[in-house]
Curated annotation (Swiss-Prot):
It holds the Pfam family RNase_HII. It is an enzyme of class 3 (hydrolase). Residues 9-198 form the RNase H type-2 domain. This is Ribonuclease HII. One of its GO terms (biological process) is DNA replication, removal of RNA primer. Belongs to the RNase HII family. The keyword Manganese applies.
């Protein structure tokens, strides 16, 4: 049940995915649904099945008034830190909309530096349908990228854990060392680099 219900003609929702992983970009999406989108089943992207997310990914793009998927790269994450890189990705997503939003809801408790009228909403992906839609676009995009990267960098299990620090991933880092898609500013990756330099 979505609680934030202001007039929705040009209200955007923004969310990002990929703060916690040790590898890959952080991906953000911004979505303006409009008042009569008729999309059923919107919910926090982490709480619905992959099959349902994939179906909604297509429906959201077909029916949204406007959407944009953006990112901050591994290099930007290492240079700026993950929080500022996440905010940068969200800012890029909003700037990529082909319609200027009248108001923006951002998932979380921090807003990017911008001049838009906006509000940060904690657990917004379950309270604001535009944020939920953005969450789905960002998660499906990033998950698919990690599956593709798993083929390019085999042995790390990226398709399964999507870059998160699971036991499989941590063991692979120790065994194989990090790749160029690993975030060197994250402690487990730094530790793996230091370990490789010992030999």
């Amino acid at each position: 049940m979505f609680e934030y219900c202001m007039a929705r003609q040009f209200v955007a929702g923004v969310d990002e995915v990929g703060r916690g992983p040790l590898a890959g970009d952080v991906v953000a999406a911004a979505v303006i649904l409009g008042e009569d989108h008729g999309i059923e089943g919107l919910a926090d992207s982490k709480k619905i099945t992959e099959k349902k997310r994939d179906a909604l990914f297509d429906v959201i793009q077909e029916r949204a008034v406007s959407f944009c998927i953006a990112r901050a790269s591994v290099e930007e994450i290492d240079e700026l830190n993950i929080l500022h890189a996440s905010l940068l990705a969200m800012k890029r997503a909003v700037e990529g909309l082909n319609i200027q939003p009248q108001y923006i809801y951002v998932d979380g408790n921090k807003l990017p530096k911008w001049t838009y009228s906006a509000e940060a909403v904690v657990k917004g992906d379950s309270l604001v349908e535009e944020i939920s839609a953005a969450s789905i676009l960002a998660k499906v995009t990033r998950d698919r990228e990690m599956v593709a990267l798993d083929e390019k960098y085999p042995g790390y299990g990226l398709a399964g854990h999507k870059g998160y620090p699971t036991k499989v991933h941590m063991d692979a880092l120790k065994r194989l060392g990090p790749t160029i898609i690993h975030r060197k500013s994250f402690a487990p990756v730094r530790a793996a680099i230091e370990q490789m330099n010992l030999f």
